[in-house]
Amino acid sequence: MVNKKFVIVIAIAAVAISFGVAAFASLVNRPPEASIGGGNPSSSVLLVHGLGEDASMWKKWEELLTNDGIQYHTITFQESDDKCGTALAHAVELGKRIDEILRSNPSGQVNIVGHSKGGIDARVYLANGTQSVANLIMIGTPNNGTPMAERTSLCAPAVWDTLPEANATKVGMNPNTRYYTIAGDWAKEVGGNPIIPGPDDGLVPVSSAESEGNFQSLGRTEHAHLELLSEEEYNLAQDVLLGRR
């Protein structure tokens, strides 16, 4: 009989490899930024990808947002071809993208949904005191860093912003924005990733994603880090995105 712990360790290795390989993938046919839907711009959603990824990771959410009649926008960071730019550089790009979105409605606001480091990028943007973002939902974001970042130099300098005690994880909160989290609690039956203390999604500790005392948790799913953009996570975020919370 195959040892479950061995299977989980192998799976963790595969996730970690994917985490790094993604940083060098999709350099051709970069997905264009999109603005879709007929909703009010004051309640539209900006979808922000994580390190080494691009806007194509949001396909499922695009479908679900459309079904709910919510206008959405995407961004693929341009600061570096491999999408491995710093949180500060990405924050500048976010500011420009949000300005574009709100140009037709200067008094409106957007909601940001960020996966992984995309949540840190959004936090750094929000630290400038802007009033343009009503809600930030962070999915699997290493808000207090992750020990996995200490084991790789792939996707630098982006990965440095996910180190424990990284300056980007310490930025202040914007009083004009409500902050929410969704975390993955993966492989609970064997205790998750043995490298990470406590429950985790294979890459990010739940304690870091939720950063208890700072943000409001919308809940947890049992998905691994790269699987956290399913309908289950969307359902946890839905009330916020529809203005019911």
List each language-model region with its residue ranges:
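N-terminal Sec-pathway targeting helices
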Residues: 1-16, 23
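Lipid deacylating catalytic domains
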Residues: 23-245
